[in-house]
Amino acid sequence: MSVAAVAPVPKPESDPKAAVRENEKKWGKTLMDAGWTCIPSTIILRQQALGLDPVDMNIVLVIAAHWWKADQPAFPSKKLIADTIGKDPTTVRRRLAKLEKDGMIERILRPQPGGRHNSNEYRLSGLITGAEPYAKEEIAKRADGQAYRKARASKKGLGLVAVVKP
């Protein structure tokens, strides 16, 4: 008898290409090809607990959409953010200042010669740090739920009579 080796089927979360294919099924290839942004569910689901109102959340989403590499901050202009979310640039400036004061974002000036500035760079490290406890809470809830379901499944067999043949 021979045994054939079978390659394990990768889980979508461990195979980035599989995850992209799954997202293409949900959103369609055209939308995915036009670009996509990864946002942790915790930030979306716990935005109120994080102190983010809808305007703040939209600003965070625009910054995230322009953040392509972990070690390179995003640098959308205030005008681009304002145009994208349909708010006045003054509103965006105030909200960015509030997000910075609240520790959700870090703004870094990019000066040019002659006293002018390029658009600011933005880091979301404060938001990430602020969301971590909520993510850990969610992970613990899931683990507790799995342990509970496992315990219930093992108890289902209790109380049943097994017929034993002599």
Could you tell me what each predicted segment is?
Residues R93-A97:
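Short, hydrophobic-biased segments on the C-terminal half of alpha helices
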Residues S77, R110-E132:
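Short, cationic-aromatic polyanion-contact patches
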Residues D83, E100-K101:
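Alpha-helical residues within the helix-turn-helix
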Residues K101-R110:
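A short, conserved structural fragment
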Residues M1-M32, K101, R123-P166:
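Charged low-complexity intrinsically disordered patches
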Residues V55, K101, N118-N120:
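Residue-level signal for beta-strand positions within conserved beta-sheet cores that form or flank
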